[in-house]
Amino acid sequence: MNEGEVLVVGGTSDARALCRQLDAANVAYTLSVATPAGKALAGDIKGQVRCGRLEYGQMVAWLKENRTRWVIDASHPYAEMVSHNLLRACETAGVLLSRYQRPE
């Protein structure tokens, strides 16, 4: 499995915790963050980190180019447009999508 086959989206502490679980299970992945600050905070993970916002069409292209099979949406709960675009992009590309839900 290559890094692009699993995509974790989010610059939150929850996303980093999920990445550490993937590290412990020896699962290759890419963490996608929107900002350089998010990239700097991701410094302790083993996966590849991509930085920059993606619009719907860019998401579809990235998923196809990287042969992504699973996306984990761990974006901030208020990032509704990101989650909406991810849902549409995964449906278009035929990719499994899981949404991380923060415990209350």
Language model regions located:
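Glycine/small-residue-rich loop that forms an oxyanion/phosphate-binding "nest" at active or ligand-binding sites
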Residues: 60-104
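Glycine-rich, highly charged phosphate/nucleotide-binding loops
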Residues: 45-64
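Phosphate- and divalent-cation-binding pockets in alpha/beta enzyme and binding domains
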Residues: 17-18, 40, 58, 81-85
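Small-side-chain structural scaffolding
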Residues: 11, 15, 19, 52, ...
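Extreme N-terminal starter segment of soluble prokaryotic enzymes
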Residues: 2-6
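Electropositive, gly/pro-rich neighborhoods at or near active sites that engage anionic ligands
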Residues: 7, 21-25, 33, 50-54, ...
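N-terminal glycine-rich anion-binding loop in soluble enzyme alpha/beta folds
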Residues: 10-46
